Structure formats: C-alpha cells, structure tokens
From Swiss-Prot:
The lineage of its organism: Bacteria, Pseudomonadati, Pseudomonadota, Gammaproteobacteria, Enterobacterales. GO terms for molecular function: nicotinate phosphoribosyltransferase activity. Signal peptide: none annotated. Belongs to the NAPRTase family. This is Nicotinate phosphoribosyltransferase. It comes from Buchnera aphidicola subsp. Schizaphis graminum (strain Sg). The gene is pncB. Pfam families: NAPRTase, NAPRTase_N. InterPro entries: N/Namide_PRibTrfase (IPR041525), NAPRTase_N (IPR040727), Nic_PRibTrfase (IPR006406), Nic_PRibTrfase-Fam (IPR007229), Nicotinate_pribotase-like_C (IPR036068). Its EC number is 6.3.4.21. Transiently phosphorylated on a His residue during the reaction cycle. Phosphorylation strongly increases the affinity for substrates and increases the rate of nicotinate D-ribonucleotide production. Dephosphorylation regenerates the low-affinity form of the enzyme, leading to product release.
C-alpha cells in the first residue's frame, strides 16, 4: 500500500467555506461548548486498512497554519471579524482530539474537544480518506483523465440544452469532502472556470483563493444539531440556531439549511421574520421538486415574492438532475446548484465513497439529524430521537 512522506492537505484553507463561517459564530457565541463527532461509512467499503496512513496524515496537519497571504485574503471579506481572524492565525490542529482505529476492518474515527476547534477536522479528514482510498484502488487515474471525462460531459450538456435559456443558471463546486484527490478537484474547477460560464464559485476556500472564485457556503447540520443541547428548550433549538446565525452575520451568508429536523418542522419555525431576513434556503435531502414547491408555497403564503429569494439545491446532483430542476424553477425563484461528488469524483469505473462525519454529542448529551431522506437520519441515542420527535410533533418513522 502506498505510503506518503508528504502532507496531502497542505493548507488550512483546503476546506469548505461553511466551516470557517460556523467556526466564527461558535467563537463568538459558544466558546466553551464541547462536542463529539464520529465517522460513518454509508457504503460497504472496508476502510480500516487505511487507518495508519490516515493517522500519519492527521499528524502532519499539526503543522498547518494560516499564512500571512491567506490571512490578508480572509480580511477582504466583510463578515470576518478581526478578533476571530487573529485567533485563527494562531490556530493549530490539536491531533490529540482525533482517535483513529482499525476495528475488524472497519475504520473508526472519534473527534472530541471544544467545538470551535473540532469544527475544522471534518472536511480534511474526509478528503484524506477519499484520496488515500482512491489512489490505492485506482493508481492509474490522473487529473487529465478526470478532465477529459468532464469535457465529454460538457459537450453533451451544451448539445442537449442548446435550445434552453441558461442565462439564469448558477452552479457552485461543493466537492471537497469526497473528491478523488486534491489535484482532480483543482483541475476540474479550473476547467469549469475556463469553459463553463455558469460556475460562480467553490466551497473550497483555498481553490477559491488561487482561482479567484467566490467562496460559497453558510452552515451545516452540526450548527442545528449542537443547538439541540445548547438551547434550554428542545422545541426552541432550531429557532435559537436561526436567531444566533442572524445575530452573527445579519444580511451576509443568509442561506438556511432545512433538513436537520425535516423540512416541515423547519418551515414551522421559519416564520415571517426569518423568511424575510434570510436570503433563502438549502435543499439537502428528500424529493427536490416537492421541496422546491413547498418552499415557494411557504414564501407566497407569507406574502413574500419568491423571485426575491434563493433556493440552493445540493443533494446528490449531476448535470441531468440540475437541468431538470432548472427548467422547473428558474422563472419562479432564484436558484443555485451545489454539485459535489459528481464533479470532483466523476470518473469512469470509479465508485466514490459515501462517507460522512457527524456530531453525536454536544456538552456530553446526544444530538440528532432527522433528515428528509431516511438513509441520512442519524443519532446514537434512540431515546433522544423520541424526545426530538415529540418536541417537534414528528412521526418516529422519520
């Protein structure tokens, strides 16, 4: 098995934008909150054999820090505050927070510590697992092969949609976590930037910086999950998460994720104030057409013109699904498409990993994600799921 005497992750910025956005909010509001996160492989892959290589790479991450040039780049964004950026400049990964084991062939990872520190581990660890796995299983694959396949997809896309008005089409790279490799992600996004006028940005801060793209992201499920134990009242946890985000960012970064406790419960909390204050909402599970119709109906019921709002679709998209949703909604609401694995690990005969790292505890107590797709629901404590369902008036079948 290939050994690495160099770090695969070479910069603190090689991660998703929403990690910095959430980290800043945690820094100002929840400095002393501690969390536990665990790795989950949703597929049949046996990944434990890579544990020692992964651990070597994690150890190398302890030397990463924000360079002066990167720090100056971060200061160009109005939503980052000086105190946070000064702290981030001194930030170092604490490798004692991460436990990695090969348990009978299964890869076990547990990350624990202060939320403001633990929050940055998820994306690089997932991208490391993905790259180590793919380089071992597909050593013949190069970034040139990935770009050649992308070129074929783009040619087919333009041919099939030559009669479609694409003037409102916007896509964003969301592919860091499950990329084939960093080189493939960079090459794919550079090619899109050069040849695909509908690319507006990337979730990867490093790639956005060097390719001069807009970094895009808001918050992840963990933001809402942690509030389940931060809030003194479980039923008000989602509302507190939405309020705290607005207090930190106001009109910036105001796209809200809807499916931590199902879309229906989210909309019950997403009242007129939130619906006006947030620029839009993000789809990450469940039927995207039903979700989009429900979102538009919600805005209309509150007397809000949907064309002033944005729907961001980001659940397992490819070009075919994207254009179908675009045709359905583009004249009724602003839409953005976040495409991940189908950009950065879409290579013939390569099967991407289906891996995640999710919060399991906050302040020593369980948290849950009750998705609109049953396969994405996650919690280690069945009793807490019952409490959450009772608080939000949900069926236990979610």
């Amino acid at each position: 098995m290939k050994q690495y005497n160099y770090p695969i992750v070479k910069t603190l910025l090689d991660t998703d934008a929403y990690k910095f956005y959430m980290q800043q909010a945690v820094f100002y509001h929840y400095k002393n909150v501690d969390v536990v996160a665990e790795f989950i492989c949703r597929g049949p892959n046996i990944l434990g054999c890579y544990s020692h290589i992964l651990l070597d790479q994690i150890n190398m991450m302890s030397s990463l820090s924000l360079s002066h040039e990167e720090y100056l780049y971060m200061t160009t964004f109005p939503f980052f505050k000086k105190e946070y950026l000064h702290w981030l400049k001194k930030f170092r990964y604490n490798i004692t927070q991460v436990k990695v084991d090969n348990y009978h062939g299964q890869l076990h990872i547990r990350i624990s510590g202060l939320w403001k520190e633990v929050i940055l581990w998820e994306v690089p660890i997932l991208s490391l697992i993905s790259e180590i796995f793919h380089r071992h299983c597909y050593p013949e694959i190069t970034s040139n092969i990935a770009v050649q396949h992308l070129n074929k997809k783009l040619k087919e896309f333009f041919k099939k949609n030559r009669d479609v008005d694409l003037s409102r089409l916007k896509i964003v790279d969301f592919g860091t976590r499950r990329r084939f490799s960093y080189d493939v992600q960079y090459s794919i996004i550079k090619r899109l930037k050069d040849t695909f006028p509908f690319l507006i940005g990337s979730s990867n801060y490093h790639i956005s910086r060097i390719l001069k793209l807009l970094p895009v992201g808001t918050q992840a499920h963990e933001w809402f999950q942690a509030h389940q134990q931060i809030s003194s009242n479980l039923r008000n946890s989602q509302t507190l998460a939405l309020k705290t985000w607005l207090s930190q960012y106001n009109q910036h970064l105001s796209i809200a994720l809807t499916d931590c406790i199902t879309m229906d419960s989210f909309l019950r909390d997403f009242n007129l104030f939130f619906s006006k204050s947030y620029q839009g909402i993000r789809h990450d599970s469940g039927d995207p057409v039903k979700w989009g119709e429900k979102a538009i109906e919600h805005y209309e019921r509150l007397g809000i013109d949907p064309t002033t709002k944005t729907l961001l679709f980001s659940d397992n998209l490819n070009f075919r699904k994207m254009i179908s949703l675009y045709k359905k909604f583009n004249n009724r609401v602003n839409i953005i498409f976040g495409i991940g694995t189908k950009l950065t690990c879409d290579i013939p005969n390569v099967k991407p990993l289906n891996i995640v790292i999710k919060l399991v505890k906050c302040n020593g107590k369980p948290v849950a994600k009750l998705s609109d797709s049953p396969g994405k629901t996650f919690c280690l404590d069945r009793n807490f799921i019952k409490s959450l369902c009772k608080a939000f008036d949900l069926s236990l079948t979610v």
